[in-house]
Amino acid sequence: MDLQNQMKKAVAQAAVDQIQNGMILGLGSGSTAALMIEALAIKIKSGEIKDVVGVTTSFQGEVLASELGIPLKSLSSVSEIDLAIDGADEVDPKFQLIKGGGACHVQEKLVAALAKKFIVVVDSTKLVEKLNLDFKLPVEVLPSAWKQVQKTLINLGGEGNLRMAQKKAGPIVTDQGNLILDLTFRNGIDQPELLETQINNIPGVLENGLFVNLTDEVLVGKVESDVVGVESLKKI
């Protein structure tokens, strides 16, 4: 196992260690979240964790959790989530995030917003000084509106194109049946709070991948002298 995967596994386990009996859990998407789901399933099977139920943020996560025997509920059936755990594509010093590399950010944001506590699990490569310098910002749009939205986003300084599928012809289609525009802002994103609102106010936009003022704790996998460890970053 390479060092990056070791870091992912370490933070996934550290997040699962915070789960208590009887919790309603938000189970995130992506490679690190998948490791977290697997670690949770092991603890449930051993009896170390009892009476928990998960709310998944993607169809992929739902399939994995179901196969591993984790009890699930739909998002619409819960009024509150005790703890949500998810990965991120970028994390800035103020705990603002870009998510949506897996095109699941709409459900991910709904789950994070409903959680009493939202933990983000990442390896150290995901920590950045400024968002969007290296990772594009995904914006989910109605299929009939993508051209109109694309033109409007140019006025906000964002240049973007449809995310295309790798193993089929045509664009990526989200779990909600929409399309993704991946945006780049020339100098990165200076004001995530403002930009999140501006983008979501554009007709035809369902949601964007900026997660603003949602994160309570970031668990970071780090390597020092070839030893993998986990650092907990919390808001002051």
UniProtKB/Swiss-Prot annotation:
The organism's place on the tree of life at top rank: Bacteria
Coiled coil feature spans: none
Protein name as annotated: Ribose-5-phosphate isomerase A
Keyword Isomerase: yes
Keywords: Isomerase
Gene3D superfamilies: 3.30.70.260, 3.40.50.1360
E.C. number(s) listed in UniProt: 5.3.1.6
Function, in words: Catalyzes the reversible conversion of ribose-5-phosphate to ribulose 5-phosphate.
Range of residues in the leader sequence: none
